[in-house]
Amino acid sequence: YAPLLEKMNELRHAREFRLLKMLEKLHNLGYEIEVEACDPNNRAVGRPHVAKALVAKGYFETVQDVFYALLHRGGPAYVPQPKLAPNEAVDLIHKAGGIAVLAHPSELSDGNLPEYLVSNFAFDGIEVYHPSADEADQEKWLALAKKYNILVSGGSDFHGIPDRFPTELGIFEV
């Protein structure tokens, strides 16, 4: 579906620009990291890749240390990630023949936001089972799925990042 591919390409370019802005901020803070050090084979380089590069260069002990010191939202090297509005994302997914699932609802800062999104933006499902969702969250998201008659999904969110749960594929079961 061409419009989805175009939007993904636009977001990929915005993400590349974001990486350059992060590296510029890091340079201004005294950290010398090149683009290639962040993961030369990955076309979707983000904060975890930058954090791993900083650890590899010996600036920090762990990826979590990097996030705590520099890359957290509002941190000195943080650059906001380009995002789609929920209605645009759901519409593109549906027009491409896909199923739109609200991912990581437990990570949203406003506890009422998942229900607002599900009830207003035609999501087909909600990710109930995820490392960030404790048992109470899972019960809440299951009730929401039942209330709006939407699909239940789950995922491990494994990214292969050292010291970040899940640390290995298969540790978190859905």
Language model: regions and residue ranges:
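Charged catalytic cores and adjacent phosphate/nucleic-acid-binding surfaces used
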Residues: 8-11, 58-61, 84-102, 106-174
